[in-house]
Amino acid sequence: MLSGKVLPDAVLAYTTSGELSPNKDNVVLLPTFYTGSHIRNEGFFGAERAIDPARHFIISVNMFGNGFSTSPSNAADSVRGSHFPDISLYDNVFCQHRLLTEKLGIERIRLVAGWSMAGCQAYHWAAQFPEMVETILPFCASARTSPHNFVFLEGVKAALTADQSWNE
């Protein structure tokens, strides 16, 4: 990971819809957003829609920390709970790249799309692997997080860590 820490036995949960074309040129990647999962991504595609399983091979990858992929609640004991390492969007995209290339044999992505933090991952895909990504469609996302958002998230974090059993 970017931090230099290791996430032992890391698992990226994902689902697919549609069929991969013989040329492997119909891949649409839908990362998940903060608090989202592959289930929430199902609303972004469907029959006769812009993203259609009849035409596209859709891969929906769950972010680390969302409960489906390796998360503070299901990680190895050494990194469970409050010991869970900081994971960046870079780390998520790097591991997604390994999933697509090493496990699924994909070399090209037609579209990476997503909203909020999934859109931020679309930006990262284009920056980290520009030769692999044809198009990105980030919406309600920014390429850089504003200072205001950091302050907002500190408030959320403070509410969680104020719990007496936070470190248990």
Go through each PLM region and give its residues.
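Ligand-binding pocket scaffold of soluble enzyme catalytic domains
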Residues: M1-E168
